[in-house]
Amino acid sequence: MTLRRRTLLTGLAGGLVAAGAAPAVALDRRRVLHVRPGDSVQAAVDAVEGGGRTIVVHPGTYREVVNVPAGVGELTLRGATGDPRDVVIVYDNANGTQKPDGSGTYGTAGSATFTSAAPGLTVRDLTLANDWLRADHPEITGTQAVAAYVTGDRSRFSHVRLLAHQDTLFVDTSALDAFDRQYFSHCYIEGDVDFVFGRATAVFADCHFHTLQRDVAFTPKGMVFAPSTARANPHGILAVRSRITSGAEDAAYKLARPWVPSYETTAWPSLVVRDTRIGPGIDPVAPYTNMRDAYPWQSMRFHEYRNTGPGSVITVPENRPQLTFAEARLHTPATYLGDWEPLRSL
């Protein structure tokens, strides 16, 4: 077991639960399913009938893959104690991991520990992690290892820890022409390369993004954001009232780079980081870079507004496009989420 896996699993109440453990899911009269050590979270999801159910996961580390299908609407998945460190759902597939049936590799989205296509999903007070490590698998070149892959409109995460390295959180949409909305509040998200990425309208409020140390000689060592917003969507990724810290040396990371997927070459990535403290781990002189030179970041919708901290210092103005006061009024959680008010029922 590596040091990272020991750190992830140490100090958690309850036992280690295997994905194949026989389910012993209890359903009470309040439409609540309880999952305890020895049970499977996926078994609880499979037992859901109808909308509006709640799954309460009791303290423990549950080593399994969890998939919430689109038909399970308005589901709440929450940790029992309110402390996200007490409940950990973790697995270790990567993009390049071979499937057991020999049908190929998982791919980026398929590597996710937690997948949801359900509209109206709420996840709170737990940890979603992918503890696959590059050092343990030098033969694998597809090193993306996703902790959570989320599609479906009105998905919300509150007080959730999302832990991985490359591609930690994939904020996607249910279709190329869908503008699915996702809301993350008071979440902790760590990783190294493109660890918050995708095409959803995704709002991060009061969140903590943390870049990890990497044992590599090159810089940048990674990027926090990699949006792939559809050209027709006026709203991509918004980070507000958040903070960005780093376990690496100063200026080792970029704030973002645009992702224009081969399956959607018309994408026009959109990112706004505002009212956020950016630590010294982000390169202040050149905070953005390209994924491919054919799609330069300067042609994308990348903006900042009223950020603070050493990583936010504007030394070369053309390298840090800023919103005006009037423009900033168009980039708020309310304007991004429209008629959906996720805080009302959290």
Regions found by a protein language model. Give the residues of each.
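N-terminal export signals
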Residues: 7-26
